[in-house]
UniProtKB/Swiss-Prot annotation:
Plastid listed as a keyword: no
Cofactor requirements of the protein: Fe(2+)
Active site: 137
HAMAP family hit by this protein: Pep_deformylase
Gene: def
Protein name: Peptide deformylase
Length: 188
């Protein structure tokens, strides 16, 4: 089921998400819906708060990018960053901020402890695009958006676009949720 994406100015995007204690059918259904919604919106990552669910769950699928065509989708539950290495800047966008792009400096390599789609504990080292997308999505679980990590002078350049989003003046090729509207997908 394709879920609407919550956009900038929705409280759920600024809240710290709660850890999951386990996986049940509702969570498995939510994961499937998140993957479907992300792909429908031509995204490569989606965190549960972006579909109105304040839980520590995210999905990533880089296979739409030629370089990562053989990669399988990744489900990450209750992530905890253990170590970071190196830094680089790269332009980022976000399904919750349609049409807005900005340069963000992030660690280029990370070590992450998390639970997978079977709730098995894992520790992995990630670099490049996967490290960047993981950090971007983990930020959503912590109530942060990529625009919070932009340099102030660059952030000021997009104030007009952010204001337009905040008042609901937005267009996207995928369903968007109105601020403050609870998602049925979260009723677990």
């Amino acid at each position: 089921m394709i879920l609407p994406i919550n956009i900038y100015n929705d409280e759920v995007l600024r809240a710290t998400a709660k850890p999951l204690k386990g996986i049940d059918r509702n969570i498995r259904d939510l994961v499937a819906s998140m993957l479907e919604s992300m792909r429908n919106a031509s995204g490569i990552g989606l965190a549960a708060p972006q579909v109105g669910c304040s839980i520590r769950l995210l999905v990533i699928d880089l296979s739409c990018m030629e370089k990562y065509a053989d990669e399988k989708p990744v489900v990450v539950i209750n992530p905890h960053l253990l170590a970071v290495k190196g830094y680089n800047a790269m332009e980022e966008g976000c399904l919750s901020l349609p049409g807005i792009l900005g340069d963000v400096v992030r660690p280029s390599s990370i070590t992450l402890k998390y639970r997978d789609e079977h709730f098995e504990e894992r520790t992995g080292e990630f670099s490049g695009m996967m490290a960047r997308v993981l950090q971007h999505e983990i930020d959503h679980l912590d109530g942060k958006l990529f625009i919070d990590r932009m340099q102030k002078r660059d952030r000021r350049k997009i104030d007009k676009e952010l204001h337009s989003l905040a008042i609901g003046n937005v267009e996207a090729d995928y369903p968007l949720a109105l601020a403050g509207i609870a998602q049925k997908a979260c009723e677990a």
